[in-house]
Amino acid sequence: MSFSGHSARKRFGQHWLKDVAILEKIVEAAELCENDRVLEIGPGRGALTHKLLNSKVSLVHAIELDTDLVVGLRERFFHETRFSLKGGDALKISLLPPDGIEVNKVVANIPYNITSPLLERLIGKLGFFPETRYERLVLLLQKEVADRILAMPGQSSFSAMSVRVQLLCKSRSVCDVSPKCFKPSPKVHSKVVVIEPFAFSERLNVDIEKRVESLLRTAFLGRRKKLRNTLASIRPLNQLESLADQLGISLNQRPQEISPMMWVSLAKRIHDMDKLVGEIQS
């Protein structure tokens, strides 16, 4: 087995994690058992893959875009009956293993240049369900993205992404990761996070989720502006003031100061108002 002559390719966002302690923390955070079937996206040279297979899981199914790395990985793990590998773009191809049976966990050092669309594919988005509901994802992310996922209302990192992910999942931080832990070293710091998507039955009504998404798109266009300005396009000011009074918020607050559940409450009130108007007009 050899990866000789293969250098990290910038267009693929390749930065290989080499720190053994961090690799072990990632595997530990996954809480793996013999029945687990794990999806790994962007295995690179197989450092994390090796650790996952040593944990005695039922299957590690890896997806790698770089065709040269696919060859090297097949050589390295050719003897492993619990390993399967598919070459291709994780944003486009099926994530299912060859046997067609779904995996239940995702453990990956995600290429930073596809973080947002890949995260959306793995956990879904407001108003839409993912192809598979994974029990747990342990992801190595760019620290800036991880901080947005974990941020609380009022913190500088709190954003529309914070609201979206927190309405779909429960998340926690595992550890920060220095650029020195990679080869080549990225220009940014990283963080390992655990993400546990809610069961489909625990999610909000689809119409309410879509309404929340619409509100977020409108409100966070003017992140630094007050709600009375950012939401002015969706309702007359007197209606907005009435809704704010009912919910105990102020239109002088900014979008990043409003909690995820308060966005849900606002979406429900507006949804009910529109429904009532529709009934009256009919």
From Swiss-Prot:
<dbReference type="GO" id="GO:0003723">
    <property type="term" value="F:RNA binding"/>
</dbReference>
<dbReference type="InterPro" id="IPR011530">
    <property type="entry name" value="rRNA_adenine_dimethylase"/>
</dbReference>
<keyword id="KW-0489">Methyltransferase</keyword>
<feature type="binding site">
    <location>
        <position position="42"/>
    </location>
    <ligand>
        <name>S-adenosyl-L-methionine</name>
    </ligand>
</feature>
<dbReference type="InterPro" id="IPR020598">
    <property type="entry name" value="rRNA_Ade_methylase_Trfase_N"/>
</dbReference>
<feature type="binding site">
    <location>
        <position position="64"/>
    </location>
    <ligand>
        <name>S-adenosyl-L-methionine</name>
    </ligand>
</feature>
<dbReference type="GO" id="GO:0052908">
    <property type="term" value="F:16S rRNA (adenine(1518)-N(6)/adenine(1519)-N(6))-dimethyltransferase activity"/>
</dbReference>
<dbReference type="InterPro" id="IPR020596">
    <property type="entry name" value="rRNA_Ade_Mease_Trfase_CS"/>
</dbReference>
<dbReference type="GO" id="GO:0005829">
    <property type="term" value="C:cytosol"/>
</dbReference>
<comment type="function">
    <text>Specifically dimethylates two adjacent adenosines (A1518 and A1519) in the loop of a conserved hairpin near the 3'-end of 16S rRNA in the 30S particle. May play a critical role in biogenesis of 30S subunits.</text>
</comment>
<keyword id="KW-0698">rRNA processing</keyword>
<comment type="similarity">
    <text>Belongs to the class I-like SAM-binding methyltransferase superfamily. rRNA adenine N(6)-methyltransferase family. RsmA subfamily.</text>
</comment>
<dbReference type="Pfam" id="PF00398">
    <property type="entry name" value="RrnaAD"/>
</dbReference>
<feature type="binding site">
    <location>
        <position position="89"/>
    </location>
    <ligand>
        <name>S-adenosyl-L-methionine</name>
    </ligand>
</feature>
<keyword id="KW-0808">Transferase</keyword>
<keyword id="KW-0694">RNA-binding</keyword>
<keyword id="KW-0949">S-adenosyl-L-methionine</keyword>
<dbReference type="InterPro" id="IPR029063">
    <property type="entry name" value="SAM-dependent_MTases_sf"/>
</dbReference>
<feature type="binding site">
    <location>
        <position position="17"/>
    </location>
    <ligand>
        <name>S-adenosyl-L-methionine</name>
    </ligand>
</feature>
<protein>
    <recommendedName>
        <fullName>Ribosomal RNA small subunit methyltransferase A</fullName>
        <ecNumber>2.1.1.182</ecNumber>
    </recommendedName>
</protein>
<dbReference type="InterPro" id="IPR023165">
    <property type="entry name" value="rRNA_Ade_diMease-like_C"/>
</dbReference>
<feature type="binding site">
    <location>
        <position position="15"/>
    </location>
    <ligand>
        <name>S-adenosyl-L-methionine</name>
    </ligand>
</feature>
<feature type="binding site">
    <location>
        <position position="109"/>
    </location>
    <ligand>
        <name>S-adenosyl-L-methionine</name>
    </ligand>
</feature>
<dbReference type="InterPro" id="IPR001737">
    <property type="entry name" value="KsgA/Erm"/>
</dbReference>
<keyword id="KW-0963">Cytoplasm</keyword>
